[in-house]
């Protein structure tokens, strides 16, 4: 029997996926927001239960040879979650932590995120427990070629369009696309995040970071303030954090921190364009650590083994967690509120724990959840798909303008939906309800499939 009540739905989740910690956390957060919908219209409860099951989960081995001639084996995944709105769309993550729970959580979030963009994209996610760190270019290439040799059977421009994520940047996308083209003998938009020279879109590398800042800007406007002059703590130092910093500098905010898995750098004077350029060189070309930033700028403080939320001292206004899931704890959130935290715009996927989100709401912090605030990346991926389908390439200015419009539309949907259901300024609830209803109604209209 399908679940008919909220209690039965929660029991089903615990029974089927109780061991999948990250997935359960993501689902329970959404269920909490959707209770108001389920109480008004119980017909949506069995639809949500059906939505929890991926349409398809593909697991495969990835054998590859290292530079010493040894055969290594990693595990590859693709979770094709929901295609009610369009082809499966979502990134590939290469990281030792990758498992089915993490990919199901990311794929589930991707369904709602893609729905919010209003672009015709379903939800999916994939990756491998392969770690590109410490590997030579040739080793990464051989792994990517082996990975795509199996994945190519399951993807396509009208079926499933992967992109990058943690551990999958421009280099990896290039190797993956080259192998797909070699095997299928077709030049098509099967991946997004491609180089602009061969089918990519301008602003795609910048899109997630830029989009999160645009969402933060809209939150500020909605609360009668401006982003200019705000002190912002960033975590991470990869693609998302770098371009969030770039846009924050352009809009007049002050960025005070960056981090990686080893520690955090704090610059009380704020990062300017020159400092950001050096950080980009360290991370993108030298593939170094943020601790090396201190070699050129000795006035910067470095905190070994610390996150920005644990070591920053001083007045601040906003945080943009751009590293990984569950990086901001309830204790971190409480500490940040004491330092003046007023706005959170998430650049990473689910970077705040449930306890941290509870603190945000309890203390009146304006919270932009990942599925809304970091949707810029997949939005421009959708625009890349559109450009590929008609063999056109828009200018950077055109894409940035479209991105800003999409992020504005996402914010308005979150704001208006939250207000409609009696929870004004609860952008998290607005995002969950608006994203869910579009997918759920589409599933109802398409029948039992």
Swiss-Prot record:
EC number: 1.4.1.4
Gene Ontology biological process terms in this record: glutamate biosynthetic process
Lineage top rank: taxon: Eukaryota
Stored InterPro entries: Aminoacid_DH-like_N_sf, Glu/Leu/Phe/Val/Trp_DH, Glu/Leu/Phe/Val/Trp_DH_C, Glu/Leu/Phe/Val/Trp_DH_dimer, Glu/Leu/Phe/Val_DH_AS, Glu_DH, Glu_Leu_Phe_Val_DH, NAD(P)-bd_dom_sf
Record keywords, A-Z: NADP, Oxidoreductase
Active-site residues, Swiss-Prot/TrEMBL: 125
Record's GO cellular component terms: cytosol
A Pfam match: ELFV_dehydrog
SUPFAM superfamilies: Aminoacid dehydrogenase-like, N-terminal domain (SSF53223), NAD(P)-binding Rossmann-fold domains (SSF51735)
GO MF annotation: an example: glutamate dehydrogenase (NADP+) activity
UniProt catalytic activity: L-glutamate + NADP(+) + H2O = 2-oxoglutarate + NH4(+) + NADPH + H(+)
Family per record: Belongs to the Glu/Leu/Phe/Val dehydrogenases family.
Subunit structure: Homohexamer.
Annotated protein name in UniProt: NADP-specific glutamate dehydrogenase
Species name: Giardia intestinalis
